[in-house]
Structure formats: structure tokens, C-alpha cells
């Protein structure tokens, strides 16, 4: 299901596909590109941002994507095998189709990298921590957004300790 709304919330495009019909990454990007061409009002796409689940120890902030960064991110597939390949597929596809289009990755693990190193450690031998075994934390983009908005939504909660739950296909607590 594809749905696009304007700044006022009015639906400007919607498409349903039959049950079980799968576009795949290439089909989805093709549909989105076609929609943007017909609804851009003369504007052009100047960049693409991606949510990427795992930045490992290498990426604790958004990163401009190039072949070297994508190669780095591929090494984290074993740490997030259900997500990372699907995060990287549209990046690679767009790199092949539009190599001059800037792309940026924002990492779900980055928010938790701001914790003290001790909080990232498991109660395991230090050699394992030094080899990269740690609490990476997930759903960080969601938590980062909530942390940035909490003061304006609930100043009293923002002034103290707050527990936030991320519940969906995956679940976490921060």
C-alpha cells in the first residue's frame, strides 16, 4: 500500500496492490520515482535519507553513503540479518540507477552509542567486548525523536526519569 499526503494531510496519491503482490525494492522505487515525476511540480529529488538498523561501532552519526560505507555496513548483516540486507538493497539500487544522487544513512544503533561504555558492556570477559560484543541498542531513531520532543509534549516527564517503550514488529525499552 502506497499513500502520499501533502503538508495539510490531504491524500495526493494512493495505490493498493492485490494481496500477495510483491513489488520488491526495484518495483517500489520505480513506483515512487514515477509518483515523484508526476507530482513534483517541477522540483527534482536532491537527496535520499535511509533508516539503517545497524551502524556497528563504525557509525554513531548519520553518514553520507558511498561504496566504502556500504561495504562497511554489509559486514553488520550477521548482527541484523532480518533488517540490514533490506536496508541496503534500495541504497545499492539507487546508487546504480542514480549514482550522482546523494544518499545519507541514519542508524538505529547510533542513539545508544552515546551511553557510557560500561552501559554497553555485557557481564562477559572483556576480550569479547573488545571483539565487538556489546549492547548496541535498537529503535534509536524513535527514541531520539521522543527525547527531542518530550519537553514540548510533557515538560514534567522530561524533567525526570522517563521510560519509553517501542512496540511494533520489534520491541524495546529505553
Specify the residue positions occupied by each region the protein language model found.
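Short beta-strand-loop/turn "lid" adjacent to the catalytic site in phosphate-handling enzymes
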Residues: 36-83, 102-104, 111-119
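Phosphate-binding/catalytic loop of phosphoryl-transfer enzymes
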Residues: 84-174
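N-terminal phosphate-binding loop and adjacent alpha-helix
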Residues: 2-41, 69-80
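Short, hinge-like loop/turn segments at secondary-structure boundaries
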Residues: 8, 66, 121-124
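Electropositive phosphate-/nucleotide-binding environments in soluble metabolic enzymes
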Residues: 22-26, 30, 42, 63, ...
Amino acid at each position: 500500500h502506497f499513500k502520499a499526503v501533502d503538508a495539510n494531510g490531504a491524500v495526493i496519491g494512493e495505490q493498493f496492490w492485490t494481496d500477495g503482490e510483491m513489488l520488491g525494492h526495484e518495483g517500489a522505487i520505480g513506483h515512487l520515482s514515477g509518483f515523484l515525476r508526476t507530482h513534483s511540480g517541477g522540483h527534482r529529488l536532491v537527496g535520499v535519507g535511509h533508516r539503517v538498523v545497524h551502524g556497528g561501532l563504525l557509525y554513531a552519526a548519520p553518514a553520507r553513503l558511498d561504496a566504502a560505507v556500504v561495504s562497511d555496513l554489509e559486514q553488520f548483516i550477521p548482527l541484523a540479518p532480518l533488517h540490514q540486507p533490506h536496508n541496503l538493497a534500495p541504497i545499492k539500487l539507487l546508487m546504480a540507477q542514480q549514482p550522482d544522487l546523494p544518499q545519507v544513512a541514519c542508524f538505529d544503533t547510533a542513539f545508544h552509542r552515546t551511553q557510557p561504555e560500561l552501559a554497553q558492556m555485557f557481564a562477559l570477559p572483556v576480550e569479547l567486548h573488545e571483539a565487538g560484543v556489546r549492547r548496541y541498542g535498537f529503535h534509536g531513531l524513535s527514541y531520539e525523536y521522543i527525547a527531542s520532543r518530550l519537553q514540548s509534549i510533557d515538560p514534567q516527564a522530561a524533567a525526570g526519569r522517563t521510560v519509553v517503550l517501542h512496540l511494533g514488529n520489534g520491541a524495546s525499552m529505553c
